[in-house]
């Protein structure tokens, strides 16, 4: 089996464009993926959800992120904030931008933002001290030298879903179905949990 990894936005475009995948995994919104005819609509299977979390430099005080108001206060007091650049296709970055708009603080925080190449890049900025606060998916917070504060509250930032399909162009349909069933199995659920994801929708 060959696994191909990419940004959420990049993978999404590849599936819509008809690139060869047997079991593509995408994130909402994905109606255009279904409309493209490149996936079997009836095969849709929710795998897991992952929240955007907050990290600080190791040993730094951990801010309160228990509510949207607390999150707004954190951003107001922070001198610099790193997160994955949504223009690079980073789904976590899209979620963060949506949160800024939802909280009504997009203009206020703009001058503090440091948009990084992917989640790993955002965490490197935190570890080095270049950014006081960093955000990306909890599953991407593996950089040495950071402390994970925790997930943003759902009322501030909606967790992102991972949804899989069987490709309409799969060379081995039975094999693709078997893989999809495994990816939604209890064994796979344990793997998702180990990476700070919640199985299911």
Residues covered by each model-derived region:
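Short active-site loop at a secondary-structure junction
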Residues: 42
């Amino acid at each position: 089996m060959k696994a191909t990894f990419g940004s959420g936005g990049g993978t999404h475009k590849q599936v819509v464009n008809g690139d060869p995948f047997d079991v593509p995994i995408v994130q909402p919104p994905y109606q255009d993926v279904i409309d493209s005819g490149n996936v079997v609509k009836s095969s849709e299977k929710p795998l897991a959800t992952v929240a955007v979390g907050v990290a600080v430099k190791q040993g730094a005080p951990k801010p309160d992120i228990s509510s949207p108001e607390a999150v707004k206060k954190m951003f107001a007091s922070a001198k610099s904030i790193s997160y994955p650049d949504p223009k690079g296709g980073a789904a976590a970055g899209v979620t963060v931008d949506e949160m800024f708009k939802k909280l009504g603080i997009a203009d206020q925080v703009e001058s503090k933002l440091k948009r990084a190449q992917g989640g790993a890049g955002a965490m490197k900025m935190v570890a080095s001290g270049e950014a006081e606060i960093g955000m990306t998916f909890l599953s991407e917070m593996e950089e040495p030298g950071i402390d994970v504060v925790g997930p943003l509250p759902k009322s501030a930032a909606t967790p992102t879903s991972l949804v899989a399909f069987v490709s309409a162009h799969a060379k081995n349909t039975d094999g693709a179905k078997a893989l999809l069933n495994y990816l939604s199995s209890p064994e796979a659920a344990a793997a998702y949990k180990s990476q700070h994801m919640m199985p299911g929708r």
